[in-house]
Amino acid sequence: MEAENGEVAALVEKITGLHAAISKLPALSPSPQVDALFTELVAACVPSSPVDVTKLGPEAQEMRQDLIRLCSAAEGLLEAHYSDMLTALDSPLDHLGRFPYFDNYVNLSKLEHDLLAGHVAAPARVAFIGSGPLPFSSLFLATYHLPDTRFDNYDRCSVANGRAMKLVGAADEGVRSRMAFHTAEVTDLTAELGAYDVVFLAALVGMTSKEKADAIAHLGKHMADGAVLVREALHGARAFLYPVVELDDVGRGGFQVLAVHHPAGDEVFNSFIVARKVKMSA
């Protein structure tokens, strides 16, 4: 226990130092300095760790909340930068590997498909909420794993959707004809949610645990009975980068948890939860 406490203390000290350095940056747009600091931060958070972020002291909790905000802003700028860079190239889909976390998305889409296959037989319609300017998850599922499925991508930012549409426009007709983009907040979606067999909720939808719980409850109110929710989540030290999703919140939202996947190595960064919408009793 003493060794475990020492490991947690050392991790918190390192992340606190990185937070201080990131906070002093003049901007969060991609640059050698920004890239180096966030690469170091991700490397510190990837290894398995005994840390439970819910048990951190008030000062560390305040640091973590601000770090989550900084990571969200930096991730949005990073994705916008690479979306613009890729679409400026001839045959942009041939150069997706330039994105620093490309391999993570390739591996993640395979894992998501493999887990879904045990619970959903060939979904006809899938929604991605929080798809962003680089809709890699839906693009890779549409291209490699679900060739007959239609994908609706939702993001609250119309500029992000414009970038995504431009990128997906370079895909084969058989892929791009099955990919649609809509500008909306998750809470704006009501009746349309009932049409989907699967709904993916991205890690950046909801910047606090309460916002995430509220989003899940909203989906539980409007998704069809038997439909499946896939929620990106974080575990261990990775929870310094995104808010934690509590399984109790998934259950209270009207879902039965079917599977929880936590990555064993560094091939995939995100954990995710697979849950089925249950019929609400009268």
UniProtKB/Swiss-Prot annotation:
<protein>
    <recommendedName>
        <fullName>Nicotianamine synthase-like 5 protein</fullName>
    </recommendedName>
</protein>
<dbReference type="GO" id="GO:0030410">
    <property type="term" value="F:nicotianamine synthase activity"/>
</dbReference>
<dbReference type="GO" id="GO:0030418">
    <property type="term" value="P:nicotianamine biosynthetic process"/>
</dbReference>
<dbReference type="InterPro" id="IPR029063">
    <property type="entry name" value="SAM-dependent_MTases_sf"/>
</dbReference>
<dbReference type="Pfam" id="PF03059">
    <property type="entry name" value="NAS"/>
</dbReference>
<dbReference type="InterPro" id="IPR004298">
    <property type="entry name" value="Nicotian_synth"/>
</dbReference>
<comment type="similarity">
    <text>Belongs to the nicotianamine synthase (NAS)-like family.</text>
</comment>
